[in-house]
Amino acid sequence: MSVADSSAADSVAAPDTADTSSSVGVFSPPGYYDALAQQVLDGTPITREQALAMLEASDLDVPAIISAGYRIRHQYFGNTVQLYFLMNAKSGLCPEDCHYCSQSKVSDAPVPKYNILKRDALMDAAKVAAERGAKTYCLVISARGPNEREMKAVEEIVPEIKQKYNLDICACLGLLDESQAARLKACGVDRVNHNLNSSESHYEKICTTHTYEDRVQTLRHVRDAGMEMCSGGIIGMGESKSDIVSMAFDLNELGVQSIPVNILNAIDGTPLEGTAALTPQDALKALAMFRFVNPDRELRIAGGRELHLRQLQPMGLYVANSVFVGDYLTTQGQAPQADYDMIRDLGFDVTGSCEEMSI
C-alpha cells in the first residue's frame, strides 16, 4: 500500500540530523517541535520527512518532542486517559507463523493452550474489567480467523456483557471475511482490532502464512460493516525507522480510529528471541511520531510499555491517551493500582471510571 505524502506547503523544514550515530547528538533548533505541532494543529499534516527526522532526532530532543506532542494530544483528548482490558479468550494453538508471537506455531514458549473459554469465565473477566475502570473489554483469540464455534460464542456473549456491564466490546479474532464482520456488527461488537504490525515492505520478514494485504482487507471489511477499526503495530522487530513511519501513515490513510503501539517483548522461544530492546527514548520518539501523524486518533501504549519505557512510562501518556490495565495476552502488566497512581500523579482523568476503582 502506498500512502501519498501530504503537501509540504506551509510545513516546517525538518532539522538536520547529521549525527544519528550517537544517542546524544545535538539539539534541534529552539522551537522546532512546537512549530511542527502548530503546523499540525493548523491543519497541515506532517510529512514523511518530518516524521522520519523525529525518529532520528537525538535523545536531547525527547523532552521537546513530548512537550510538543502533548499540545496535539491535549487539543483532541484533553487530559483524559481511556483504559482497556484484555481477555485472552483462546490461547496458543495458532497455525500462523508470526515470529513475534508466543502463541504461533513456530514458538516454543511455554504458554497456556486452551480453546475458547466458557461463558462464566468470559463474564467473570468482564466484571473485572468494569471494576478496574476499563471502558472497553477486548476479547482476543489466537487463530488465523474464527471458526463457526468461536463466532457463535462471541455472538452469544457480547450482548450479555454489554447489557450487564455497559462495556464497549473490541473483538480481536484474526482475519475476517465480509460476512463475519457483518455478524460481529449485528451482535453488538463496537470495534475490531487487527494490527498491521509492521510496514508492508517489512511484513514478510515477520510472517509468511498471510500477507500485509490480508490484514488490510480485514480492516476494510470491518469498516464496511460499520464498526470502528483498531489497528496498530509492534516496533522493535528489526524494522527500519522508515518502516515505522510507513506504518503510521498507512494507519492514517485507512482511517483507523484507535492505534495501539506495542514495543516488542522478545519472548524466549519465539523466532525474535534475543532481539535488541529499544531504549525508552526511542520508544517515546516513536509514540510521539504516531501522535503527530495521527493527531485526532486514539493512541494507546500497549504491550511492552513496562519493559521498555520503565520509569519513563508517565512521559508516554503526554502523547498517548490510552493504556491497557492489567495483563497482556501471555505476559504480565504492572499492577492496576500502579497505573491509577501514574494517571493521578499526572493530573489526568480516566474516561468512564467507576466507583470501585481506587484512583
UniProtKB/Swiss-Prot annotation:
EC number: 2.8.1.6
Binding-site residues for [2Fe-2S] cluster, renumbered to this chain: 138, 170, 230, 300
Keywords: 2Fe-2S, 4Fe-4S, Biotin biosynthesis, Iron, Iron-sulfur, Metal-binding, S-adenosyl-L-methionine, Transferase
Entry-linked InterPro entries: Aldolase_TIM, BATS_dom, Biotin_synth/BioAB, Biotin_synthase, Elp3/MiaA/NifB-like_rSAM, rSAM
Pfam families, alphabetized: BATS (PF06968), Radical_SAM (PF04055)
Region span, Disordered: 1-23
Source species, domain of life: Bacteria
Top EC group: transferase
Function (record text): Catalyzes the conversion of dethiobiotin (DTB) to biotin by the insertion of a sulfur atom into dethiobiotin via a radical-based mechanism.
Matching NCBIfam families: bioB
UniProt subunit comment: Homodimer.
Record protein name field: Biotin synthase
Source organism (scientific name): Rhodopirellula baltica (strain DSM 10527 / NCIMB 13988 / SH1)
